[in-house]
Amino acid sequence: MDLSKFLKEKRLQAGLSQGAVAKKLGYTSPQFVSNWERGLSQPPVATLRKIAQIYNISANDMFEVMLKATIDQVTAELTEKFYKQAKTK
């Protein structure tokens, strides 16, 4: 699961709207939260900690999701490069 899906899932489990989360974080528009949940941008690390508090989840769980997504992305990129190089030889 990537961070965007994780954030949306946890917000819904907390019973909060995007607008309510934005307001708790001090944003004037829910568009920030929407963008995070659609993977268009990522919240700053300090904001992730606040989100964890608002959703009553462990910040470590959130960072583990981010780490796994990064590892998966790097693995996919390296695999693609490996196969491209193998085809040219």
Can you say where each PLM-predicted feature lies in the sequence?
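Short basic helix-loop element that most often maps to the first helix and adjoining turn
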Residues: 5-24, 79-87
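Helix-turn-helix DNA-binding elements, focusing on the entry/boundary residues of the two helices
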Residues: 7, 18, 30, 45-48
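Residues in the recognition helix of alpha-helical DNA-binding motifs
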Residues: 10, 24, 35-36, 65
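The short coil/loop that forms the "turn" connecting the two helices of the helix-turn-helix
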Residues: 16, 27-28, 57
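DNA major-groove recognition helix of helix-turn-helix/homeodomain DNA-binding modules
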Residues: 20, 46-61
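Recognition helix of helix-turn-helix/homeodomain-like DNA-binding domains
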Residues: 26-42
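Short, charged recognition helix plus adjacent turn
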Residues: 53, 63-89
